[in-house]
Amino acid sequence: MLSPRYILPLHDELVIDLFAGGGGASCGIEQAIGRSVDVAINHDPEAIGLHQANHPQTRHYCADVFEVDPVAVTHGRPVGLLWASPDCKHFSKAKGGKPASKKIRSLAWIVVQWAKAVQPRIICLENVEEFQTWGPLGPDGRPCPQRKGQTFRQWVGSLRNLGYEVECKELRACDFGAPTIRRRLFVVARCDGQPIQWPAPTHGDPRRLETKARGLIPWRSAAECIDWTLPTPSIFERARPLADATLRRIARGIVKYVIEARQPFLVSL
């Protein structure tokens, strides 16, 4: 069901999904505005194939985002919403110590290119929180600590110089009804003179008293979204044995969430 609080009045404006992947963001946008995105762009044929299967009404471009001309794509129609979720692995703390790719770290500049070319009324970018540390790489191919965040500030400044009001917030989807506690950065830019409005949390930590006091719904768990009746091979039946580190993590999880938990996590099969 659509919440009137979140419906964007896009009228006849186009909705564009850059870095569309298999369509996760497009599905969320469709739930929010009540229709499919108009254009989806991604370089991966398999991802675009999956997106086409789930969003047949959408116009698809299987290409590098920098090779797609915004003016040619939009055919003179106004763009109401441009959504971008560029590759995050070269910013994420989960990446480890491997050198970063300068090309991948520069993907977000495509947003500025679209802003210059067709001036979308609203721009949204989603990424890991470390995206705010975007800066130049040193000679060793790793981010330069002394210039942390420099490129990110330049990127935001470029949008503001084009007439956009820009705001950034770190949000967790679990506070809005999705079963994940991961924190993500959301950047919203508008050039229509209207204020940027952020949603108020609808869900909260069930262990905290303020969740009930504020009338919030308890966080959902991933277990609620899994059909446990589906036959699935056991992780312990793999041909390749599990690594010792993996086994230790499993053991720690059993201790924490089953043996020592106030409410042990158990699934009836």
Locations of the language-model features?
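S-adenosyl-L-methionine
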Residues: M1-H43, A47, G49-G76
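Generic enzyme active-site microenvironment
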Residues: V15, A40, W83, C124-L125
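Short, well-ordered alpha-helices that flank and scaffold nucleotide-derived cofactor binding pockets
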Residues: C27-Q31, A53, Q113-K116, G157, ...
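Conserved beta-strand segments of alpha/beta enzyme cores
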Residues: S36-V39, R59, E165-E167
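Conserved short alpha-helix immediately C-terminal to the canonical SAM/SAH-binding motif I
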Residues: E46-L50, L107
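Class I S-adenosyl-L-methionine
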Residues: V68-L81, C88-R238, L266
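Residues lining hydrophobic/aromatic ligand-binding pockets adjacent to catalytic sites
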Residues: R248
